[in-house]
Amino acid sequence: MFNLSALPFDIDCIAADFSINGNFKEYNALNDGHINSTYVVSFDDKGETVKYTLQKINTGIFKNPDALMSNIVGVTTHIRSALLKAGRDADRGTLTFLKAADGKYYFRDENGDCWRVYKYIDKVYTCNIIDSAEVFENAGRAFGEFQRQLSDYPIDSLFETIPKFHDTYSRFLDFMSAVKEDRAGRAEGVRELIDFAVARENDTHVLLDLIERGSLPLRVTHNDTKLNNILFDRDSNDGICIIDLDTVMPGLSLYDFGDSIRFGANTAAEDEKDVSKVSLSLPLYEAYTRGYLSSAKDSLTETETEYMAFSSKLMTYECGIRFLGDYLNGDVYFKTDYPEHNLVRAKTQFALVADMEKKMDEMRRITENALK
């Protein structure tokens, strides 16, 4: 038996507020997430074990839990409707959140902490490493399906939980402020990297200008399209459910696609010190693009598909200037393991940008072929 007073949460209070039946059995902490505290909790309900996922929302980052949960529940409800219309298993294809006693989808405890609960999806697994083109193609198919399912979602009903998250020009201005202020006295030693970033300032306007002209539609975007945010079915290996929806908000489909390529098609780790190992894997780019477009192409505009290759470079560049800017500011945002960590990350991103520029024509050809 657990000593309930030793638990990192008041399970009796939470269970009562979310009307969870049965007796609490056990819990396991999940350590994959970096923002919220997540637990799988099990209850014995008349001899049957029922599992739920319990999360403490990080209100230091997500200061408006009402807006946050409005986005998430709106999106998951929309996906559920699409799955049911298609005759598919909606309980496995999207997250199902429980409603608290006050009608909201989170519960605030006596300490002021906010908790949410959704039904646990069984017989699935997550991946942290892309060990084959097949895995990455399945990931592309899953995120493409996510985009397709939400292509008719009313964008005006979404809240912007993190303002200007992928406004690359705004990120560039933040970077230039970091260069000018040079708080950590590091700018002189990285002048070559600063020049690399400044030389590509014009790229930061491209997608924003297309939005301004009405050439790119705002979509529901996930904004954290990592491999481990997909639940894969244990039997079929298909990506069946997209999770970690905290950063769902209005944006461009190109942001999600480009960021997937940035982290997934790099031949080296994000913090590889030997930049000669850094390059864009064209086979992985092709695999993800093929999977993504197999699901999403009918819901995307011609302009969106035209800029898919470019968006891969832009998201990589944006990440690079964020790492370098944080290095210049004294490493105040990203967690680092050693003093030069953000600098190493920036060098890796810029090396990937340079390689993408060399391969841009081939990336565009691959995209065009995947559309046929």
Task: State each model region's role.
Residues 356-359:
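Long, compositionally biased intrinsically disordered regions
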Residues 1-11:
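Generic start-of-chain signal for non-secretory N-termini
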Residues 26-30, 34-44, 48-177, 253, ...:
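Conserved ATP-binding subdomain of kinase catalytic cores across diverse folds
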Residues 3-5, 21, 28-32, 55-56, ...:
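ATP-dependent phospho-/nucleotidyl transfer catalytic cores
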Residues 12-23:
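A short, low-complexity linker immediately N-terminal to eukaryotic Hanks-type protein kinase catalytic domains
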Residues 63, 232-300, 336-342:
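Active-site Asp-x-Gly
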Residues 305-315:
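Small/polar glycine-rich anion-binding or flexible loop at a beta-alpha turn
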Residues 321-336:
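Zn-dependent metallopeptidase/amidohydrolase metal-coordination segment
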